[in-house]
């Protein structure tokens, strides 16, 4: 369709076509959620054997950098995601809670492995927290003992979808 550059001569249908092809209508919140979902800065909390699989996820074979998640942060003040990987004990729980409180908003949590999700084989122990969600809120659970790097990548993608589409999962403003 040939469109005249003079706006005065455009019909309503031509204007609608130009809008569909050249203008993106969105909200600033949607842009922020898109950016947040594509550039998560994780803080690793490797408490057991799941940490080895988390390290493998960052290696070249699985390349989590292609999703924008390669920048593991050393400080909770710089991170927006904690990956709790492994067994959480009641003695360690206050430290994890303190780290969670030090993170800026919005913040997300991935529970990686059976131990982090439910306490795993140690759930009946007096010293083990039967799931990280008893201490801090969890956004995505990655089951397995230990979960493969592909499962952690799937967890990242599920979290990305949750961040970018907060209305679909009942969130307000991404959290």
Curated annotation (Swiss-Prot):
It is found in: Cell membrane. It comes from the Bacteria. GO terms for cellular component: plasma membrane; respiratory chain complex I. [4Fe-4S] cluster binds at residues 49-50, 115, 145. One of its GO terms (molecular function) is iron ion binding. NDH-1 shuttles electrons from NADH, via FMN and iron-sulfur (Fe-S) centers, to quinones in the respiratory chain. The immediate electron acceptor for the enzyme in this species is believed to be a menaquinone. Couples the redox reaction to proton translocation (for every two electrons transferred, four hydrogen ions are translocated across the cytoplasmic membrane), and thus conserves the redox energy in a proton gradient. NDH-1 is composed of 14 different subunits. Subunits NuoB, C, D, E, F, and G constitute the peripheral sector of the complex. This is NADH-quinone oxidoreductase subunit B. It comes from Heliobacterium modesticaldum (strain ATCC 51547 / Ice1).
């Amino acid at each position: 369709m040939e469109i005249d550059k003079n706006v005065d001569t455009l019909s309503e249908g031509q204007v609608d076509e130009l809008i569909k092809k050249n203008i993106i209508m969105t909200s600033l919140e949607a842009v922020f959620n898109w950016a947040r979902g594509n550039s998560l800065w994780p803080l690793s909390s490797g408490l057991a054997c799941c940490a080895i699989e988390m390290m493998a996820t960052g290696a070249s074979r699985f390349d989590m950098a292609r999703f924008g998640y390669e920048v593991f942060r050393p400080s909770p003040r710089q991170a927006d995601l904690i990956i709790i990987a492994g067994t959480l004990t009641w003695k360690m729980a206050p430290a994890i809670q303190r780290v969670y409180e030090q993170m800026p908003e919005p913040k997300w949590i991935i529970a990686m492995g059976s131990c982090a999700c439910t306490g795993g084989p140690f759930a009946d122990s007096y010293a083990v927290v039967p799931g990280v969600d008893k201490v801090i809120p969890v956004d995505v659970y990655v089951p397995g003992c230990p979960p493969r790097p592909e499962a952690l990548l799937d967890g990242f993608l599920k979290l990305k979808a949750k961040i970018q589409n907060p209305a679909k999962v009942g969130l307000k403003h991404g959290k």
